[in-house]
A protein has these predicted regions:
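A short, hydrophobic beta-strand element within the central beta-sheet of small alpha/beta folds
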Residues: 70-83
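The C-terminal output helix
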Residues: 108-118
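Short amphipathic alpha-helix used as the core "switch/output" element in two-component signaling
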Residues: 40, 56-70
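C-terminal output helix
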Residues: 98-107
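Two-component/phosphorelay signaling modules centered on CheY-like receiver
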Residues: 10-30
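As written
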Residues: 85-94
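Conserved acidic carboxylate
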Residues: 6-10, 77
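Acidic, metal-coordinating helix/loop segments flanking the phosphotransfer/catalytic sites
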Residues: 31-49
Length: 118
């Protein structure tokens, strides 16, 4: 599986990448603090899921909407989860602190054809 992690919080990027590698050994992870770099990656390579945080989310979703990207986006949320109508294309909200169980639960919503590749 290929994931993209987008966050202005470098420490959070590292923690999330370590957890994803634990849940999906051998997965490929692209980390970035810049939504534009992530969009460039999405346009050249299929990414199974994007993880982002509330600080980066508005910019990322604006870019995704502009590119009509269908990639699943998971919002990492420090506070109360926003209502569904505010999360747009977000598949799931993962509340802090992020744990392996929360990632596994969120990724169960990934389409079956992707899960079969794992």
């Amino acid at each position: 599986m290929i994931f993209a992690n987008v966050s202005v919080d470098r420490e959070q990027l590292t923690i999330l990448s370590q957890l994803l590698l634990t849940v999906f050994p051998g997965c490929v992870i692209h980390q970035s603090c810049d939504p534009l770099r992530t969009m460039a990656r999405l346009s050249t390579q299929k990414v199974d899921a994007v993880f982002t945080d509330a600080d980066t989310y508005p910019d990322l979703m604006q870019l995704l909407d502009r590119h009509d990207a269908k990639t699943s986006v998971y919002l990492l949320c420090r506070h109360d989860a926003p209502p569904p109508e505010e999360t747009g294309g977000v598949r799931s909200v993962i509340m802090y602190p992020i744990t392996r169980q929360k990632i596994q639960a969120a990724l169960q919503t990934v389409p079956r054809e992707i899960m079969e590749v794992i």
